[in-house]
From Swiss-Prot:
Entry protein name: Uncharacterized protein ycf92
Keyword rRNA-binding: no
Compartments, record wording: Plastid, Chloroplast membrane
Disulfide cross-links: none
Any one of the GO CC terms: chloroplast membrane
Main location per the UniProt record: plastid
């Protein structure tokens, strides 16, 4: 059985290649693994800066087929305009009597107080957003096989049941998740193409049918995979990892 068969290639950008593609896959994966491990312990301010950087990087990858110099200039231009607008607005508010410095200070103090009370939720949202952006950009610039093979030296060095279980489950879990996402995208495309939203009389019945069909497909996939594992007696004890690069 080919465990390195990838269902994530639909995210990978084959062409054109960027500087992220040319980085060594092992070094890139090790750095991101270490970076994501220490990221939850950083300050909220640095989390926000990091998410802004990832957003710019993500937009850059989305528009890589265009002239990237013009795209970068547009981003810098928009950031400068936004900064200038905030600066002018602040000076305008300070010049108006109704918005004195005292009221502006109270506003920022109240805003900081609200952020402090909800700092746990803010950190959670920032961490989840950062993880999502990091994983998505990694899959856009690194093949799934390179990600798995980056950890092969560790698997060969520490051959024990726990690592084999984690590797065995992770390989099939990622493929199953991607297959589930493909099913969801197919349902959404079907709804848009058939224009079910215009059929008000049977709209909810169609949605219920699609949801039940989706659950039935997931059950069939689980049953089929479990049957194959049982018939062929596949488990983590049969996993043998070797570094082929």
């Amino acid at each position: 059985m080919n465990l390195s068969q990838s269902f994530l290639l639909n995210r990978y950008i084959q062409s054109p290649r960027t500087w992220l593609h040319r980085l060594n896959s092992n070094n890139k994966i090790y750095f991101l693994f270490f970076y994501l491990s220490i990221f939850p312990y950083t300050d909220v301010k640095y989390m926000t800066y990091s998410i802004i950087f990832y957003t710019i990087l993500f937009l850059y990858l989305k528009h890589i087929d265009k002239n990237y110099k013009i795209f970068i200039l547009r981003i810098v231009y928009k950031v400068c305009i936004f900064t200038l607008a905030i600066s002018c607005l602040s000076k305008l508010l300070l010049s108006v009597n109704i918005f004195r410095l005292k009221y502006i200070s109270d506003f920022f103090l109240n805003l900081m107080s609200i952020c402090t009370r909800n700092i746990l939720y803010i950190r959670s949202v920032l961490i989840l957003t950062h993880y999502f952006c990091t994983v998505h950009i990694t899959f856009m610039t690194t093949t799934y096989e390179d990600i798995i093979f980056a950890f092969i030296p560790l698997f060969t060095q520490y051959q024990n049941n726990i690592i084999k279980k984690v590797a065995f489950i992770s390989i099939f879990a990622l493929q199953a998740i991607e297959n589930t996402l493909i099913k969801i995208y197919s349902i959404l495309i079907t709804i848009k193409m058939k224009q079910f939203t215009k059929v008000f009389k049977f709209q909810y019945y169609i949605y219920i049918y699609l949801i039940l069909k989706f659950i039935q497909d997931i059950y069939n996939d689980i049953y089929r995979i479990s049957t194959v594992f049982y018939v062929r007696e596949l488990n983590h004890k049969m996993s043998y990892f070797t570094y082929i690069y």
